[in-house]
Curated annotation (Swiss-Prot):
It is a multi-pass membrane protein. SMART domains: acidPPc. It comes from Porphyromonas gingivalis (strain ATCC 33277 / DSM 20709 / CIP 103683 / JCM 12257 / NCTC 11834 / 2561). It is found in: Cell inner membrane. GO terms for molecular function: phosphatase activity. Pfam families: PAP2. GO terms for biological process: lipid A biosynthetic process; lipopolysaccharide biosynthetic process; response to antibiotic; symbiont-mediated perturbation of host defenses. This is Lipid A 4'-phosphatase. Its main location: membrane. Belongs to the lipid A LpxF 4'-phosphatase family. The gene is lpxF. Signal peptide: none annotated. Disruption phenotype: No longer responds to changes in hemin, decreased removal of 4'-phosphate from lipid A species. Accumulates pentaacylated 4'-phosphate lipid A with concomitant loss of the usual non-phosphorylated tetraacylated lipid A. Lipopolysaccharide (LPS) or bacteria from this strain are a somewhat potent inducer of the human innate immune response via Toll-like receptor 4 (TLR4) in cultured HEK293 cells; double lpxE-lpxF mutants are more potent. Loss of resistance to the cationic antimicrobial peptide (CAMP) polymyxin B. Coiled coil: none annotated.
Amino acid sequence: MEYILEVERNLFLTLNGVQHPLLDGFFYLISAKWTWVIMSIAFLFFLFYKKPTKEALFIVGAVLLSVLICDQLSSSFFKPFFARFRPSHHPDFIDYVKTVYGYRGGKYGFISGHTTNYISLALFTSRIFRNKFYTWTIWSVVALVIYSRIYIGVHFITDIIPGIAVGLIVGHFVYKVYLYARSRWLGASCPAHPSAVYAGDSIRLWTLSLIGFVFAMLCMSRQLTEILQYYVFLLF
């Protein structure tokens, strides 16, 4: 056990120690919840524009269910139950961990709520759309978000791994609930699978928009961070 803890400590400090001004802004932005508001609006537009309203509403409902379950599990159950300090608050790490722009997060970090939420949403949406381009893209973006939690110093690796497991379970559960509800209430009025509704140029355009958004954050990370820090007091 001591060996495992030492390995995790060294690996965490190595991953956390890869600091660069450009990456500071990028990982700070990609980790912030409010940064994704514009893409959330774009996602709603993608779901509803020239698509069956009921089909889109079922997907929105499933996404909200996923977020609700993940938030409750991570914030209301795991964090207060295990009460494990984040690296940025842990007495054994606080002098060694590198934070970004002074952000340290809440007191407890087990499990990672960001990881749980993003993994669940990635699994659910990749199963909904069944598009390889989108699947590779969304999982790549999720990997960046997960690493950002280590980079900015607010999660241990052992906060991340259980978060991945819980996210996969929740994502699978929500997908099954969605399929059941969809077949029961939409029935013969809808295609056999929602991927038929969102196939073709529609899903490709949404995926390219997602890639473009992440690339824009990387290219303009320092400028965007300065603007957001000036106008928004709380990004997370």
